[in-house]
Amino acid sequence: MKHKFLVSFLLGLTISFAGAQVIAKTPSVNNAPVARSVNQSPIQLEVIKSYQGHTLKGEAIIQIHYSQDGNYLLSTATDGLAKLWTADGELVREFAGKPVAMIFNGAFSRDGKAIITAGYNGVARIWDVQGNVLGEILGHTSAVTDVVFLSDDMGVVTSSDDGTIEGWSNIKEPLFTVTRPGVSRNMDFNAQTNLIAVTQDIGEITLLNPAGKVVRIIETDQGRLNDVDFSQDGKLLVTAGFDGTARVFNLDGQEILKIDVLDDGWVTGVAINQDNLIATVSDDGILRVWNLQGQLLGQYNPNLERLGSVSFHPNGKNLAIAAYHGTIILLELQ
């Protein structure tokens, strides 16, 4: 999550949705017709589909995440909605709490059968993909900023504006609380290393194990960290910084790469695929793809002012980006 947090709150809005069935369909992202080529760089970025995922205004927040099996894409936003899409951009279902509150982030369970959302009202809510609420977590005194599922029924972890990181069992019993300086903003979990990475707005990354033990604190000079992503093997961490850089760290905390993405503005989101290609989105509205040597391989400017989130499909060839006003764009690396 990468965010200028909002001070407003959506109150009194009631939304109901039709009970459509969730169809587990194989995504057609690999076979989708190519709309257009957007550059002539070493990596081509082909637009598959662009659509209005959410209707957002002002300093909005939008996040996108693919499911582990690659069949679905989850979008969450400060309009108070989470939306489940097929991987080729067809809407399956909308989720809204009661009362509706802005959603700062979300995540799929490892098996893709549930999602969890992080609410401005301090509530983390767990849903099945049919839209039923399975439970609510009410342990924070301020906004929930991010949420992750752990593996093998180990529970979930939440982070918050109140500076705490909290672990919860599958029956929503508290397992641990870790307090860190500042706001804990963004998280990622890697099943290979069994580690949780949590960013703080003072430029630190806290590495935890599922028992809540702090394994390492990595200090950066990026200022507020807007996003963090593990490499697939869990050996590398990529961060998006307030200072306009993306950085790559190993688990010992050593910085192995600094990418100067832009001179004036934030890097708002990062993602890394299994080939260690790094995608960045930023305040200047440009998606860029880099290698681990820091070389720019390709870029795409959708002319949407600011981009807020990026996610690689598990196949490593497709990716999705989201703009602050709610547009979602699906692309393929060529």
Curated annotation (Swiss-Prot):
WD repeats lie at residues 56-86, 98-128, 139-169, 220-250, 262-291. Signal peptide: none annotated. It comes from the Bacteria. SUPFAM superfamilies: WD40 repeat-like (SSF50978). InterPro entries: WD40/YVTN_repeat-like_dom_sf (IPR015943), WD40_repeat_CS (IPR019775), WD40_repeat_dom_sf (IPR036322), WD40_rpt (IPR001680). Keywords: Repeat, WD repeat. One of its GO terms (cellular component) is outer membrane-bounded periplasmic space. This is Uncharacterized WD repeat-containing protein slr1410. It comes from Synechocystis sp. (strain ATCC 27184 / PCC 6803 / Kazusa).
